[in-house]
């Protein structure tokens, strides 16, 4: 191969060999070609099986509560041959998985990434402080200093909404939240809040879910209300199989339906 290309691909390193700069570039390009081949093979399999296929989806904890159930229901009705492989986690973890080609798309909050990505908004959301309905702070206006006296369930400091929350306490000269439980996924947090007596910071959409509306309440403080967009993220230039495109289309339609229902509720 070196003779054919006319360039050194390996160099001596002690008793072994290591790649030269040209060798590293060739290796990276080879991996990209290999991934393209596998992607094309998957597409051919999907087409031969009637628009079926596997879509690897990363989903944020909040989206598993208010978006994912409706997405799965619609997919089963429209394209029952599509299979979802779901990873639930925080944005930072999911993005690492996407960069490694472990997942194809992310459904969750749209945040800034260092690597180039495509992002499609699906719906709007607000992150608010929540607690059980019998929490001492429930049902009355409270200050940041009041909340700093109680324990919290929060994600790691690498997660954007945790950084936003800490910044709000810091800028208002209040002690940072006293984190009693640090959690890797917010999917199980609503149940924990209801039983543990701890505060948390989570999607307002979850608080109106039938399962939690009688158990959880938003703590009355307008300073700690973080607006955000929720949508779909994938790597710029990534190949999207027909099955993946269908999941994206269904997710967008579910988001539109949710927004029109929310508007109707406000009008009523």
Cite the ranges covered by each PLM segment:
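Hydrophobic hinge/microswitch elements
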Residues: 90-103, 109, 161-218
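Secondary-structure junction motif
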Residues: 137, 151-172, 240-249, 255-266
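A late-sequence structural motif
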Residues: 67, 188, 217-261
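A short LG(V/I)-centered, amphipathic sequence patch enriched
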Residues: 2-19
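Alpha-helical linker/hinge and terminal dimerization helices associated
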Residues: 4-5, 26-48, 258-261
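Hydrophobic residues within well-ordered alpha-helices
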Residues: 20-23, 57, 97-99, 147, ...
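Short beta-strand-centered segments that line the small-molecule binding cleft or hinge
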Residues: 28, 32-35, 47, 70-74, ...
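Central regulatory/effector-binding core of bacterial HTH transcription factors
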Residues: 52-115, 175, 182-183
């Amino acid at each position: 191969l070196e003779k054919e290309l006319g360039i050194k691909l390996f160099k001596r390193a002690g008793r072994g060999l290591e790649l030269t700069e040209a060798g590293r570039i060739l290796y990276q390009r080879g991996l990209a070609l290999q991934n393209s081949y596998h992607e094309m093979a998957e597409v051919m399999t999907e087409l031969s099986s009637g628009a079926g296929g596997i879509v690897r989806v990363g989903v944020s904890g909040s989206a598993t509560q208010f978006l994912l159930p409706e997405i799965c229901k619609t997919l089963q009705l429209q394209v029952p041959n599509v299979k979802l492989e779901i990873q639930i986690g925080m944005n930072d973890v999911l993005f690492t998985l996407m960069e490694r080609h472990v997942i194809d798309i992310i459904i969750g909050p749209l945040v800034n990434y260092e690597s180039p990505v495509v992002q499609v908004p699906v719906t709007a959301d607000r992150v608010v402080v929540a607690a059980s309905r019998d929490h001492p702070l429930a049902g009355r206006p409270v200050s940041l200093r009041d909340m700093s006296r109680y324990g919290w369930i929060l994600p790691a400091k690498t997660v954007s909404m945790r950084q936003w929350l800490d910044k709000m306490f810091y800028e208002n000269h209040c002690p940072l939240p006293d984190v009693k439980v640090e959690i890797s996924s917010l999917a199980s947090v609503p149940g924990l809040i209801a039983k543990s007596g701890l505060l948390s910071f989570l999607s307002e959409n979850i608080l109106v879910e039938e399962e939690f509306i009688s158990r959880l309440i938003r703590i009355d403080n307008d300073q700690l209300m973080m607006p955000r967009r929720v949508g779909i993220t994938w790597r710029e230039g990534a190949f999207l199989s027909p099955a993946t495109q269908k999941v994206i289309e269904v997710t967008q339609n579910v988001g539109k339906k949710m927004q029109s229902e929310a508007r109707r509720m406000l009008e009523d």
